[in-house]
């Protein structure tokens, strides 16, 4: 039962929360600016994670090695620096995504274009001298075809809103690589908490610079439900469930595949709550993107793994 909860229920719940959060982002985009929304939701996520840190540590069974006062200070400084780097990358990613939605990108299309990062991350491993499995290269080719169906119009142009979301996928790739660098050295939830704080700070600075004259407390309060949902549930709860699933699961491939269903739930939520509709070509693009994401996460055959080692 415990394995079912951690390996299936937790990642599936996380994917549902992340997918449905695109609806909240889309409805907020009609009322407040991208930087205002992200400043508020990331601050809410920061507070949520601050509360969840003690709860998460109850589930963390790994022994903690005692540190000297000097080591604690060095560890804390490293945590802050790691959170700053991760938060800067996340601020770039989530603001590009929200700007794309403000410019008109639908919730469903945004969810699928964003998942392009799942394919891009292994490719970026080439620069770190990591082997890229054949399934990933196949996924890249299918993803390119999927992006063509989703984004490219009949006159071979791309809508500006889709272009911003595509840039967001590259920014999320950077953010994941930065997290991959710092995560092994620090508590995952604590790192995410600091990350959300700096993302909120960067977004607030951009809000004051670019949206200061448009800031309306009435509009902000009207979107408070969406802000709290995305901040607390998508940022705080879902991230914690993801970490618990990845720590406890004996099958990381299944967990990652279930998490990638975020894009499917995004399209379903957009259709149910926003009555969004896509063309046949765009639905084909969604299917191709999902196939590409699944291929990118499949483990390489054992013979190839042995050859690489």
Task: Tell me the role of every PLM-derived stretch.
Residues 21, 56-113, 147-149, 231-249:
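Specific transmembrane alpha-helical segments of multi-pass solute transporters/efflux pumps
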Residues 16-47, 105-109, 174-199, 213, ...:
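Juxtamembrane helix-loop-helix junctions in multi-pass membrane proteins
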Residues 3-8, 31-39, 75-79, 152-171, ...:
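Juxtamembrane helix-entry segments on the extracytoplasmic side of multipass membrane proteins
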Residues 1-40, 88, 92, 96, ...:
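Glycine-/small-residue-enriched transmembrane alpha-helix faces in small-molecule transporters
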Residues 7, 31-92, 118-124, 171-178, ...:
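Transmembrane alpha-helices of multi-pass small-molecule transport proteins
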Residues 42, 51-53, 57-58, 223, ...:
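C-terminal-most transmembrane helix of multi-pass membrane proteins
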Residues 49, 132-152, 172, 203, ...:
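Hydrophobic transmembrane alpha-helices of multi-pass small-molecule transport proteins
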Residues 40, 110-116, 179-200, 235-272:
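Helix-helix packing/entry segments at the starts of transmembrane helices
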